[in-house]
């Protein structure tokens, strides 16, 4: 996943409040339970020296009556919420933390940002497009093609073939227009995936006119449904889950290959050194909610190291100790790398041969590099 949407969180750092709270309201006395949880978090953060204004901003976000999520992750500094995320289940661990950096990794693991994609309902007169971007933004558009002739005549005679050809030409023309809008929309939001429903013939024609990458990644729903229908949304969820799983496995396979050629590293210290050099393309991380690994960091996004001495040698005057995963998240966001959580079966196998000789990357972290040091 790309983390560019988190970049504004790092415009200013220091005294960051990170709160993960169970806000499930389906149980009896839920409001009272939430209030108790938040009071405990408030006391913990106050004791750590958190800014009262920042705590007030978090309290306002958590107490929002319009927010009905089962869990919330809220990040604040200098008296303002900088980012918040709704969880569809209570957080795996309730967290109340004050640190230099926001602790975003649990949010990314439990509620990753949407995969940019398009949902399309094709008709013989055009179609409907729903676009979902990587930060959750969405929009809807309609493509209106030619309205006549779209029906084949059942009347015999010398003109029947001409009417049928005209109708088919109209369908094809409308499919081309819809395909052009789909391709343009995909480019605007960076989508590589499209889910297509609608009229059988219109779906087929649309797929013919899509670009090869979109056509090959398309998932088809064999129903005449609207682009914003529940059926298409559910189909999109299944397809995107399959695509994401396949993508991380293919990229991890590539990492194992690159490791042997100097274009891959594993372990916290080598990965952080690669970030300092601007080398990291893809970071792979074993999802471990219990991790307590730390890193030394500076003000710059790529200022992170396993030891204070390394950062001092790199020119950072006053390194500060913070969570390693918080430092990695910032480095990913600010260097245009991508984050991938490794499926459990890739890091828990007992047979090294099944995983290219590697059952688990050292420290649960590894990276594919844009270039090797030798290659410049």
Task: Set out the residue ranges of the language-model regions.
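Terminal alpha-helical anchor/extension segments at protein ends
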Residues: 1-376
């Amino acid at each position: 996943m790309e983390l560019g949407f988190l970049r504004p969180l790092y415009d200013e750092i220091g005294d960051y409040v990170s709160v993960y709270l169970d806000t499930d309201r389906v149980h009896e006395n839920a409001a009272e339970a939430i209030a108790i949880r938040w009071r405990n978090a408030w006391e913990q953060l106050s004791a750590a020296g958190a800014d009262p204004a920042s705590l007030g901003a978090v309290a306002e976000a958590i107490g929002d009556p319009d927010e009905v999520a089962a869990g919330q992750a809220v990040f604040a500094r200098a008296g303002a919420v900088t980012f918040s995320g709704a969880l569809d289940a209570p957080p795996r661990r309730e967290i109340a933390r004050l640190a230099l950096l926001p602790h975003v990794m649990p949010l990314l693991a439990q509620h990753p940002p949407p995969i940019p994609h398009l949902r399309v309902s094709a008709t013989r007169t055009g179609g409907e497009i729903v676009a979902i971007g990587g930060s959750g933004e969405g929009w809807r558009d309609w493509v209106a093609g030619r309205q006549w002739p779209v029906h084949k005549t059942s009347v015999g005679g010398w003109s029947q073939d001409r009417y049928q050809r005209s109708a088919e030409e109209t369908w094809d023309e409308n499919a081309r227009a819809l395909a052009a809008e789909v391709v343009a929309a995909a480019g605007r939001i960076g989508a590589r995936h499209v889910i297509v429903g609608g009229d059988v013939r219109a779906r087929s024609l649309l797929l013919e006119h899509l670009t090869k990458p979109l056509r090959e990644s398309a998932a088809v729903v064999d129903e005449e449904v609207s682009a914003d229908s529940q059926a298409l949304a559910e189909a999109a969820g299944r397809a995107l889950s399959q695509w994401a799983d396949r993508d991380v496995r293919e990229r991890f396979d590539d990492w194992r290959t690159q490791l042997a050629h100097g274009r891959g590293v594993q372990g916290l210290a080598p990965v952080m050194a690669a970030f300092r050099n601007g080398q990291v393309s893809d970071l792979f991380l074993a999802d471990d909610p219990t991790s307590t690994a730390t890193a030394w960091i500076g003000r710059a996004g790529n200022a992170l190291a396993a030891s204070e001495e390394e950062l001092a040698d790199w020119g950072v005057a006053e390194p500060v100790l913070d969570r390693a995963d918080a430092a990695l998240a910032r480095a990913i966001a600010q260097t245009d790398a991508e984050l991938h959580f490794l499926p459990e079966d890739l890091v828990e196998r007992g047979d090294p041969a099944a995983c290219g000789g590697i059952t688990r990357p050292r420290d649960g972290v590894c990276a594919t590099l844009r270039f090797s040091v030798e290659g410049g």
